[in-house]
Each structure stands twice: as C-alpha cells, then as structure tokens.
Amino acid sequence: MQGRLDQSILNLPGVELARRNLEAALLLLKALMEQGLSQAVLCPGSRSGALALALGVLEPRGLALYTAIDERSAAFFALGLARATGKAVAVVTTSGTAVANLLPAAVEADYGAIPLLLISADRPTRLKGCGANQTVNQESFLAASVRWFGQGDGTGLAAMTDAAIDALARQAWSGTRPPDLAPGPVHLNLSFAEPLHAGGQALLEATAHASLDTTSSPWGELGLRTPGSGNQAPPFSPAPDPDQPGV
C-alpha cells in the first residue's frame, strides 16, 4: 500500500509501538491544526487513547480542548461551536457504538451546511468479522450524511508514513468545505493496534518526532512525571489492561 511503513513497524516491542501510535496521532492532529483546526471535543475511550493523549499535548499549543462523556452530546456541542465560528470543530471518539451516537449531529450538520470533523478510533481490520468485542462496521455508520469519508491504514495508523498521515489530515480538513458542495461533516476513521497508551520517555520522544517544543510539554497536566525526574510511582494503576482488545 502506498504510504505504508515497513510492515515490521507493527512487530515492534510494546513501548516502541505505543510511541509510534502517539507519534502518528500527534502528526495527524498537528496537520489539522496547521489547516485551521482550533477546537476539539474529546470523548473518553480506550481505543482512542493515542488521540486523547495527543490532544492533551496540543492543548497548550493553541488547541481549545473540551471533554464530554456522552458522544451524542459532544457532537451537538461541537456542532454549536462550528455554527458560531464557521470553522470545523473536531469530535474524537473511541470505537464501536460510540460512533453511532455521532449520527444525529452529523445529520444536522449535513442539512445545516455546518463543517464538522468526526474522528473515530477503530480496531485493526484483522479484528473485524471475528467476534472481537466492540468491533462493528463503524465505517458505514455516518455514510449517508458526510461530505467525505476517509480511513487510515487498516493495520493501524502507526503503519503509515508521516507524509501519508499529513496528506490524510489535509484531505479530511478540505472535505469539510468541498469546492462543489456546501460545507458539512466528514468522517475520519483510524485504526490503532495495541498497545494503545504511551507515557514517560515514549511521550517525550513522540512529541519531539512531531517537531513540537518538548520544553513546554504539560507533564503535570497529563498526570505524568517528567522523564529523568526519579522513580516516582504512577498516579494510578488500573486493574484491567487498557491495551487489550475488548477493553
């Protein structure tokens, strides 16, 4: 596939693949900000962990970030922001039925000619059609209402080259205002392979890879210790493993 890194990227040790997931998420969101994205609404979830962490890194760098528990409410909140500003606002969700909850706002954005950027995390293609938890055909959920639909590599966003990620982000942003149609919603569906969460040194390296100023990384705001600051215990250690399918 054009724009794919060597397949061995997905066979990296866990920490390195988690770092690449975060790098890819940062590169995508940074490219969207360069196109004009200035506001995003985040809904909590495990599969979208890299996107959530990337949004947190970018918040002090010019991105207004809001959080919401309910995806339907989040999408309508973003719709209101987009209507007020005339610029697309991003809504970021996890996989599964979370995506279905975006449909009402997508319909409103479609008929109201309001630009809206709906970004959903997804499981890799290999987990589709085999009974994996929270795995559905979310690619088609919003198809009837969006101006444009795009996907990352089916094996995982981490498998795409930096240039391909940048191009995908630019396509998504331009899709909110197509030259031959009224403005409207777009759906960007992104697969992420486990492990999903990077922290510590991996976070610092991913931030540097995305050409972001690492001296102002909001470590405290993200609940992480600064790399090299000592062997401090993490703020919490949940019992379930968030990097495993089905969580």
Q: Where is each model-derived feature located?
A:
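N-terminal alpha/beta PP-like core and its mobile active-site loop of ThDP/TPP-dependent enzymes
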Residues: 2-247
